[in-house]
């Protein structure tokens, strides 16, 4: 694991732990039980719950992202939609911010966190997870040093 990826994961784990302690979030042990049970509750799970339950993700990524806000509380990343399309059932809710993405090829999951909490999850094949990871790796080649530095925003 490269230094940037390790530092980025560490920052998000810290954010997750702090947000868990300072909010109405379930305690980490309860979050881990939810992850083990496959109960991925939106706005109630943090990156540490997944890392401590499943181990390090196959891929991680961080970028400013636009989201479609859904009535059920999910935030669907604009990148998961075809260009110019919106998700079925979407009305007017929008959100944006620095998102943290985790993808587990062995588990077949793509997870998105905003402000340290799970806002979107999608089951996908290992092949598709690897394709997403390769895309993130390709995109990271074009980031400036300022964008790549954890803590520099």
Task: Tell what function each PLM region has.
Residues 18-21:
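C-terminal motif of bacterial Sec signal peptides marking the signal peptidase cleavage site
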Residues 1-11:
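Bacterial N-terminal signal peptides that target proteins for export
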Residues 23-153:
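Residues within mature, well-folded domains
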């Amino acid at each position: 694991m490269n230094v940037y990826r390790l530092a980025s994961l560490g920052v998000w784990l810290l954010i997750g732990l702090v947000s868990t302690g300072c909010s109405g979030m379930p305690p980490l042990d309860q979050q881990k039980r939810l992850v083990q049970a496959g109960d991925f509750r939106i706005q109630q799970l943090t990156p540490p719950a997944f890392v401590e339950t499943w181990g390090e993700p196959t891929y991680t990524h961080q970028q400013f992202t636009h989201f479609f806000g859904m009535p059920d509380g999910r935030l669907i990343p604009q990148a998961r939609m075809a260009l110019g399309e919106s998700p079925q059932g979407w009305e007017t809710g929008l959100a944006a911010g620095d998102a943290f993405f985790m993808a587990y090829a062995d588990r077949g999951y793509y997870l998105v966190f905003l402000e340290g909490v799970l806002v979107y999850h999608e089951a996908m094949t290992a092949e598709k997870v690897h394709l997403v990871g390769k895309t993130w790796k390709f995109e990271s080649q074009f980031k400036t040093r300022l964008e790549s530095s954890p803590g520099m925003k």
